[in-house]
Regions:
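Residues within well-ordered beta-strands of beta-sheet-rich folds
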Residues: 102-106, 164-166
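Charge-lined substrate channels and their catalytic hotspots, especially those that engage the 3′ end
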Residues: 1-104, 111-156
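Polynucleotide-recognition surfaces of large bacterial nucleic-acid defense/processing enzymes
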Residues: 157-180
Length: 180
């Protein structure tokens, strides 16, 4: 229950308090999470336009998209997200060579699925990031994207943007490249 604390003309608390609203705790959240969501006006729902855009997305990646990209599916990338994460959006690989290291950083290619200036794009810009609490997440993108299509799960084809850097044994970059 939320109440307004009212003081009289001398600064003393006036009783009884004025009850202004009831804060409901959603399943999987705590009163502290609900309070943070309310106090910071964090968005938790998706508009009908975004729901329609998400419904049009397919989880199977078009073979034509895969054919245009560098195939790195046989490389042993590891995700750098926690074990309990659902949205594995980045992965790394380091290879030791005779004179240098190859560092690869793969990031889920969200832009392939979120069109510029679409409702989803505008909402993602507004949200700016996913908000992580100890027991729940308020995602920047709908679940179908963040936890499925753009999640770098093992043994599942995903589209990524890769940064590749050759680094000498002193830690100096020798070259870099970016590709899909």
């Amino acid at each position: 229950i939320e109440c307004d604390v009212v003081r009289d003309q001398h600064g003393f608390l006036r009783l009884p308090f004025i009850f202004s609203s009831v804060l409901q705790v959603k399943p999987g959240r705590t009163i502290f999470v609900e309070t943070a969501i309310r106090n910071h006006e964090l968005p938790v729902l998706w508009s009908d336009d975004i729901k329609r855009e998400v419904d049009l997305l397919t989880e199977k990646i078009d073979a034509k998209l895969i054919a245009k990209r560098r195939d790195m599916r046989d490389m042993p990338f590891v995700t750098i997200d926690g074990q309990d994460a659902k949205d594995f959006d980045d992965a790394v690989l380091v290879e030791k060579k005779p004179d240098y290291f190859n560092l690869y950083v793969a990031i889920a290619d969200v832009a392939e699925f979120v069109r510029p200036f679409s409702a989803m794009d505008e909402e993602a810009r507004t949200r700016g990031t996913s908000v992580y609490f100890s027991n729940c997440v308020l995602p920047m993108l709908p679940d179908k994207l963040s936890n499925n299509i753009c999640s770098l799960k093992p043994e599942v084809d995903r589209l990524v943007i890769v940064a590749h850097c050759k680094i000498d044994y002193e830690g100096r970059p020798l070259s870099q490249d970016f590709y899909e």
